[in-house]
Amino acid sequence: MSQPGRVDKQPGYILHTQPYRETSLLLEVLSRDHGRFSLVARSARRPRSDLRGVLLPFQPLTLSWFGKGELRTLHAADWDGGVRALTGLPLVCGFYLNELMMKLTARDDPEPRAFSVYDRAVRELAGGAPLSTALRRYELRLAQVLGYAPALSRDSRGEAIAADRHYLCRDAALPEPDEHPELAPVGRVVRLPGEALLALDADDYREPATRGHARLLSRVWLSALLGDEPLASRQLLQAIQSLSD
């Protein structure tokens, strides 16, 4: 008879680990089809455990587990390979990916697109992509796929974004046509050219100006979504957002 709530061979990543009881680990995982939740890896801290070299952050895994409720039990884990271990600044950026994912997602709320956004960001960091590009893409796209922020193809009036116009991006709302370009934006708002919004909507970060505009937009969106103290280290967020290619 199969175990209750058993799931086999599900793509996933480990977001956080901590010791659990004498020899086990408590894992916070992000799975493709089941969202974010907690798993117990029994005896994973024993010296001869096969899991010791597998349960690593920022590595694509295939996870199997059983059980229901808030805490499930890991049955098996396999390393999918193909991703270089993160070190140095990419590793710090990886911790930021994890913290932002845990802040913006609810447990047991599956969103396969969020998993894809995370997977792409990890692979970009491991593959030597420009760090600021990888992070800005992750921030903006994650907010969009989770339903917190809009697509950037249309404005607040429902009209197509025009490349030759400027728009006010306020909080995480649709861009508003800028009717008063002579006035400086006030509050949690940034003025951006339509050309930049269209580039971001097309996932085109090739131009340095576009990457700079992405940084401004991500600051506005994350400030609206996370509040005044969004992360354990506010300085870490500020340092990462100041990166430039």
UniProtKB/Swiss-Prot annotation:
> Can you list the GO cellular component terms from the UniProt entry?
bacterial nucleoid
UniProt GO BP: DNA recombination; double-strand break repair
InterPro entries recorded for this chain? Answer: ARFGAP/RecO (IPR037278), DNA_rep/recomb_RecO_N (IPR022572), NA-bd_OB-fold (IPR012340), RecO (IPR003717), RecO_C (IPR042242)
Q: Which UniProt keywords apply?
A: DNA damage, DNA recombination, DNA repair
Q: Which domain of life is it from?
A: Bacteria
Q: Does the keyword Hydrolase apply?
A: no
Which Pfam families does this chain map to? RecO_C (PF02565), RecO_N (PF11967)
Q: Belongs to which family?
A: Belongs to the RecO family.
The free-text function statement in the UniProt record for this protein reads: Involved in DNA repair and RecF pathway recombination.
Q: Which NCBIfam families match?
A: reco (TIGR00613)
> Mind telling me which PANTHER family this protein's record contains?
DNA REPAIR PROTEIN RECO
Protein's UniProt name: DNA repair protein RecO
Organism the protein comes from:
Chromobacterium violaceum (strain ATCC 12472 / DSM 30191 / JCM 1249 / CCUG 213 / NBRC 12614 / NCIMB 9131 / NCTC 9757 / MK)
